Amino acid sequence: MGSKTPDGHRQSPDASNSSELKPASPNPKPSQNGSQSADLDRGVVGEDDDDDDENEEVGVITTNAEKKKKRKKSKKKNKKSKSGAAPATQQTTPPRVPLSTLFPSGYPVGELVPYENTARTTDEESQYNSRLWDEDLLTDYRQAAEIHRQVRQYAQAELIKPGASLQSIAEGIEDGVRALCGHQGLDTGDALKAGMGFPTGLCLNNIAAHWTPNPGGKDVILEKSDVLKVDFGVHINGRIVDSAFTVAFDHTYDNLLTAVKEATNTGIMVHVFLDDLVGSEVMESYEVDLAGKTIPVKAIRNITGHDILRYNIHGGKQIPFIKNNNPDKMEEGEVFAIETFGSTGKGVLDDDIGIYGYGRNANVPGSHLRLASAKSLLKTIDANFGSLVFCRRYLERLGVKSYHLGMKNLIDNGIVESYAPLVDVKGSYTAQFEHTILLHSGGKEVISRGEDY
């Protein structure tokens, strides 16, 4: 989920580390936790009534009678096992088998790439950094990453096709994530244990980021000529894996997708200082032939990658992918979303009409609220989403009604921030690729890497 500049579009940092820290392990054990709506989009609010057998041993000689008894026992056992569900050994279609069932001994490790820390680090700092990643923390990230891989594989094969509605694609992705996490998010607080890291972004053509189907909007149908960005996050215990890809059915856009994918991979190889990132140079070496014209691919300059904190998709660091004077550096113990965006347009994004989603501003208390509907809505937000970004679909899934006036009041008071879709000029096409990387004592781990991208 991209962070727009200069506004930032990010939550306040609120990181928390495990109280008992251990050195990073390459293969840790798995964690045990596994019409009014449209008006609100436009900022208009109307009237709202808010107020193996048991005895079987190697080397034991048995008589024929004993063998017969054992056969009878095993037959009973087999009969009993037929009546129950057989243990799953592979994922279903659609994905519904919890990941903890498929990976009882540990989750896959991401791609490990060389990490050259050229900064001076004292022995004390090195010892502290090596303890930042405990086994449960790494397990949470790796579980979330594998869920992302399995769900997006299903989405690419079964959901994302010409003629499909974006609503059905979003719901298919989100249903898969919740099933594999083992948390449906319907009970109070359940969505904070595991589930969606933020609403599924499904952005067509000149819409580069921050669009999702919402109640009150028209049902958008995916066409063969469209370029679709798919951006979704998975979290386990607040540890968010953020990854995105682009789909185009027309080979006309192959160079656009290749340019952005290569730029993202270039960004992943950056070692420490964020001003070293030169993904834009890679991206802008490509051209796209559109309607008989050769159009250079432009790097979108006012949207960036970002660090990720616990329960906060946007931390305090931005990761621009154009040449810059950013003094920030990547440090061991941090998590980053490395993403790049390319366009056949002007390469600058503006806010569009509508609202993608909302994020709680943890720095602003709600104690001064007077509107009853705003107080009630804030209580629901804090109990179910905390500082995770959410959308109206998620509120209505919980059964929340008549929330429009209360939401406007929360936004007006700075307690909740709204996110608008980000667009380039009409008629242009945009693409995005993104991965989450972890910097730990074992190196740089591209946690969301898969065979697809």
From Swiss-Prot:
Amino-acid positions noted as binding a divalent metal cation 2 in the UniProt annotation, renumbered to this chain: 242, 306, 339, 434
Reactions accelerated catalytically: Release of N-terminal amino acids, preferentially methionine, from peptides and arylamides
Binding site for a divalent metal cation 1: 231, 242, 434
Feature: compositional bias, Basic residues: 67-82
E.C. number(s) listed in UniProt: 3.4.11.18
Location(s) in or outside the cell: Cytoplasm
Cofactor, how bound (note): Binds 2 divalent metal cations per subunit. Has a high-affinity and a low affinity metal-binding site. The true nature of the physiological cofactor is under debate. The enzyme is active with cobalt, zinc, manganese or divalent iron ions. Most likely, methionine aminopeptidases function as mononuclear Fe(2+)-metalloproteases under physiological conditions, and the catalytically relevant metal-binding site has been assigned to the histidine-containing high-affinity site.
GO molecular function terms listed in the Swiss-Prot or TrEMBL record: initiator methionyl aminopeptidase activity; metal ion binding; metalloaminopeptidase activity
InterPro entries: Creatinase/aminopeptidase-like (IPR036005), Met_Aminopeptidase_Type2 (IPR050247), Pept_M24 (IPR000994), Pept_M24_MAP (IPR001714), Pept_M24A_MAP2 (IPR002468), Pept_M24A_MAP2_BS (IPR018349), WH-like_DNA-bd_sf (IPR036388), WH_DNA-bd_sf (IPR036390)
Basic and acidic residues composition-biased segments: 1-12
Keywords, sorted A to Z: Aminopeptidase, Cytoplasm, Hydrolase, Metal-binding, Protease
Record keyword Protease present: yes
Protein name stated in the entry: Methionine aminopeptidase 2-1
